[in-house]
């Protein structure tokens, strides 16, 4: 059973679904009906049905490409009934690789176009300073009064990273403590964007994917990254004293 669960969850993580109707008109009555039905289930039935919910939830977490949920369920039942799949394992792997590759390339192009459009428009906004043409910009949110950072020291800071749509993908604030970060270990746009910051300053960095993770890493490929950074302390001699 453990092997079955592991395989199904591993499969589910990679694939999204289509065909789900989330119409809100009958949501309350549907929920009440579901609660009545659930109360009549045995413990094993509850466990099994909850696993189905978990599988569906895992399937819907990614938007790389879509599968037909109805056909997914039919395929599971066919396997249980001992029937053959419409594709051999080799054919499936080949077609899946082709679909994933095409989806990845489309997402790369789409995100790159969005990043370049954003930077082009953003540089015209008040307070935005361009450090590298169409690649790296920043805006000062709060002026600092401490020492000026230069080079790549180890910096004590708070940061929040987000995408163009405002979705946060990482933040030091989640741990309530600032992070001590060697600027030699971060993406180029982050360390370059912090140059000239004063201790106490809060700055928003706008980083083109070429100066971030590009098409590699765990984030969506060619994502423009936005970091709000507060420099608390530059822990290195490679700083200058503010006049």
Swiss-Prot record:
What are the boundaries of the signal sequence? 1-14
What EC numbers are recorded for this enzyme?
5.2.1.8
Q: What class of enzyme is it?
A: isomerase
**Where primarily located?**
membrane
Q: Name one GO cellular component term.
A: cell outer membrane
Picking any one GO molecular function of the record gives: peptidyl-prolyl cis-trans isomerase activity
The cellular location(s) given in this protein's UniProt record come to: Cell outer membrane
Keyword entries, A-Z: Cell outer membrane, Isomerase, Membrane, Rotamase, Signal
GO BP annotations listed? protein folding
Q: Domain PPIase FKBP-type spans what residues?
A: 152-235
* Record carries keyword Transmembrane helix: no
Instruction: Please give the annotated consequence of changing residue 117 to E.
Output: In strain: L2
Entries under InterPro entries matching the protein:
PPIase_dom_sf, PPIase_FKBP_dom, PPIase_FKBP_N, PPIase_FKBP_N_sf
Q: What is the effect of changing residue 56 to A?
A: In strain: L2
The cross-references to Pfam families, in alphabetical order and at most eight, read: FKBP_C, FKBP_N
Tell me what reaction this enzyme catalyses. [protein]-peptidylproline (omega=180) = [protein]-peptidylproline (omega=0)
Its biological purpose: PPIases accelerate the folding of proteins.
Task: Spell out the family assignment given in the record's similarity comment.
Answer: Belongs to the FKBP-type PPIase family.
| Name under which the protein is recorded | Peptidyl-prolyl cis-trans isomerase Mip
Q: Which organism is it from?
A: Chlamydia trachomatis serovar D (strain ATCC VR-885 / DSM 19411 / UW-3/Cx)
Q: What is the lineage of its organism?
A: Bacteria, Pseudomonadati, Chlamydiota, Chlamydiia, Chlamydiales
């Amino acid at each position: 059973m453990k092997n079955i669960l592991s395989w199904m969850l591993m499969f589910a993580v990679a694939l999204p679904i289509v065909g789900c109707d989330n119409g809100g008109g009958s949501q309350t009555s549907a929920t009440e009906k579901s609660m009545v039905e659930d109360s009549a289930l045995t413990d094993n039935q509850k466990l099994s049905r909850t696993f189905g919910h978990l599988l569906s939830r895992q399937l819907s977490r990614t938007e790389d490409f879509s599968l037909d949920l109805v056909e997914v369920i039919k395929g599971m039942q066919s396997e249980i009934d001992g029937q053959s799949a419409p594709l051999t394992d080799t054919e499936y792997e080949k077609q899946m690789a082709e679909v994933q590759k095409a989806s990845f390339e489309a997402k790369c192009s789409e995100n790159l176009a969005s990043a370049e459009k954003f930077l082009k428009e953003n540089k015209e906004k008040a307070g935005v300073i361009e450090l590298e043409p169409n690649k790296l910009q920043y805006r000062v949110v709060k002026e600092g009064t401490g020492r000026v950072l230069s080079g790549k020291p180890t910096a004590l800071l708070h940061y929040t990273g987000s995408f163009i749509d405002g979705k946060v993908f990482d933040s030091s604030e989640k741990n309530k403590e600032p992070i001590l970060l060697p600027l030699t270990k971060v993406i180029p746009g982050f360390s370059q964007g912090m140059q000239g910051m004063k201790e106490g300053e809060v700055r928003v960095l706008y980083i083109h994917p070429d100066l971030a993770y590009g098409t590699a890493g765990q984030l969506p490929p060619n994502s423009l990254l936005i970091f709000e950074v507060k420099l608390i302390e530059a822990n290195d001699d490679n700083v200058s004293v503010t006049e």
